[in-house]
Amino acid sequence: MSKLELYNIYAGYEESKPVLKDISFFVEKGEFIVLLGTSGCGKTTILNLIAGMIPISAGELYIDGVKSNDTPPRKRNIAMVFQNYALYPTMTAYENIAFPLQNAHYKKKDIDSSVKSIAVELGIDDLLERKPAEMSGGQQQRVAIARALVRKPSLLLMDEPLSNLDSALRNQLRFEIKKLHKSIGATIVYVTHDQAEALTLASRIILLSNGMIQQIGTPHEVFYEPANEFVATFLGNPKINLFTSNNLIA
């Protein structure tokens, strides 16, 4: 498990137009942090810079107390789960899950033990001989999560992993991810635009708009004690009603 710290981060895909502006937050070991906001607010960009896939223009990133701005992605011990599953279509579920261990030159018996163990934990042990085309979307996502977790990363990044699933399956996997987090105690940074998902899963929520943090807090804090009008109107269904007044009510 890793502790993550970001200080005054600026980043973007064009130097003159930063996507992220003065981003600062920390993630404690074993915490489940959800980055929440509308499309284009910068939440996936944060995930990508934590993983080392885009450079940091300014500011500092620390993983377990070590400055990691220029640390190559392969040396960060981070795993990532994507929206589109990203499974190898010609490989079975077993081979997909085993791939990162084979790439790291684990012994064959250790690979077999690790793959079967995580498969049982995620309820996919009966799918190990199937290829992705023979599995449902939910089953493929479980395999993708198993592949990410099998090498015991210190930090797990999840980029809208449930957004391609139907409502019923999304609810089921949401519960399973929460249960899995409790059982393995991993440090997780999770991206979503779905407020129900964020409020259900998060230890704390980081709510973003236009590349800037609007509020950081527990689900209870951001819902019942919004820091500004944006947070108040973004959360809740139906949305709250706003009105203007010239009088201050004591």
Positions of predicted regions on the chain:
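ABC ATPase nucleotide-binding domains
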Residues: R76-A79, Q83, L87-F230
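A short, flexible loop at the N-terminus of ABC-type nucleotide-binding domains that lies
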Residues: M1-L6, A11-D22, D70-P72, H105
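Conserved coupling/switch loops of ABC nucleotide-binding domains, chiefly the family-specific signature
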Residues: S57-E60, N210
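Helix-to-loop junction immediately C-terminal to a conserved catalytic motif
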Residues: A51
